[in-house]
C-alpha cells in the first residue's frame, strides 16, 4: 500500500471533481485517510478491462454521450465485481475507483445517512491511492482513458 498511497493530501485530486462531497464514497471524510489505511493488514488489488470492437473504437461520440456510456458501463461492472468480492471475502472492506455504485441516488446531498454504511466502498483515489501506478505495478496494466469523443 505504501508504494501507491500519498497521505500528504490524499483528497487533493478529488477537490476539482463535481462529485466532491456529493457521495458518501467521496471526501471530505470524518476519518483521516491514514487512519483508514492503518486498519488493513492486507490489500488485494483486482481490476477490470474492457475490450471494444473495432467499430466501437472508430466511432465518434458526442462527448456527453461518451461520458454517460462509460459511466454506465463501468458502474454496472463495478457493481458485479463488488458483489462477487463481498461474497468471496465476507466482512472485507471493498474499495472502488471513482464513485459509489450501490444506489442510483446518494443520500449525502439530501443530508441523510448512507443507506448501506456497511457496504459502502470508498474511492481509492480519495484515500490517496495512485490507481494508475498501482495498476501498472501490480497488474501490469496501463490505464487508458476515453478522449473527448472516442474510446481509448
What feature does the model see in each segment?
Residues 1-152:
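Catalytic cores of enzyme domains
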